[in-house]
């Protein structure tokens, strides 16, 4: 197997906390020219979906954002990753591990009131 070389061409910073009562955004940035990009996609699943759902983005100024409304699609957690395919056939993804394998992010959707109550208790 060829050795993986990490090239930071696709960037995503997971949010620290996601709430089950508020719309949140999953955003990815890419360092590729829009002329080189064939498709940018988010793949996500929740505890209510056993398979990943693909959300293809429209090309727009290197900013790709997906809004998730937990009130419309209730879930306990969301697992996701992003892919970028180029016109030359190359494929990139984020997040990946040191071997280049996709390592999806899993974030639990928390109750905001309970989260801030526990956080306040920790400060006291």
Per-range role (PLM):
Residues 1-124:
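Glycan-association/targeting regions that enable binding to alpha-glucans and other polysaccharides
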């Amino acid at each position: 197997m060829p050795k993986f070389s990490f090239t930071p061409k696709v960037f995503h910073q997971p949010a620290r906390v996601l709430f089950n009562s508020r719309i949140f955004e999953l955003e990815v940035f890419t360092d590729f020219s829009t002329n080189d990009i064939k498709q940018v996609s988010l793949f996500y699943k929740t505890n209510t979906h056993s398979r990943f759902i693909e959300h293809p983005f429209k090309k727009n100024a290197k900013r790709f954002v997906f809004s998730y409304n937990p009130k419309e699609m209730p879930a306990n957690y969301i697992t996701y990753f992003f892919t970028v395919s180029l016109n030359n056939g190359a494929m990139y993804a984020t997040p990946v591990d040191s071997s280049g394998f996709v390592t999806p992010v899993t974030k639990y959707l928390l109750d905001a009131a309970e989260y801030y109550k526990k956080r306040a208790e920790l400060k006291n």
